[in-house]
Amino acid sequence: MALDSAKKQEIVTKFGRGENDTGSSEVQIALLTKRISDLTEHLKVFKKDHASRLGLLKLVGQRRRLMRYFKRKDKDAYLKLVAELGIRDNI
């Protein structure tokens, strides 16, 4: 489930350090969080979509690794990002 370019640009401008900052950890975590929430809603409707479920697990693992790195790098910004995205700090 890909994000449309307008929604992706909105997330990049909200969480990025610059207008075209797509590589920073904050932006990557925010984009993954949006994709995870969209895929979770999809799986609530289509319960037997096992291929998408495996993709969801892959995205969650990727986000977990990025969050672990970001927490080590800048703990204050990490805590702010977690609060803003509304996700748990269980790393």
Swiss-Prot record:
One of the primary rRNA binding proteins, it binds directly to 16S rRNA where it helps nucleate assembly of the platform of the 30S subunit by binding and bridging several RNA helices of the 16S rRNA. Keywords: Ribonucleoprotein, Ribosomal protein, RNA-binding, rRNA-binding. It comes from Sulfurimonas denitrificans (strain ATCC 33889 / DSM 1251). InterPro entries: Ribosomal_uS15, Ribosomal_uS15_bac-type, uS15_NS1_RNA-bd_sf. It holds the Pfam family Ribosomal_S15. GO terms for biological process: translation. Belongs to the universal ribosomal protein uS15 family. It comes from the Bacteria. HAMAP family: Ribosomal_uS15_B (MF_01343_B). Coiled coil: none annotated. SUPFAM superfamilies: S15/NS1 RNA-binding domain. The gene is rpsO. Part of the 30S ribosomal subunit. Forms a bridge to the 50S subunit in the 70S ribosome, contacting the 23S rRNA. One of its GO terms (molecular function) is rRNA binding. This is Small ribosomal subunit protein uS15. GO terms for cellular component: cytosolic small ribosomal subunit.
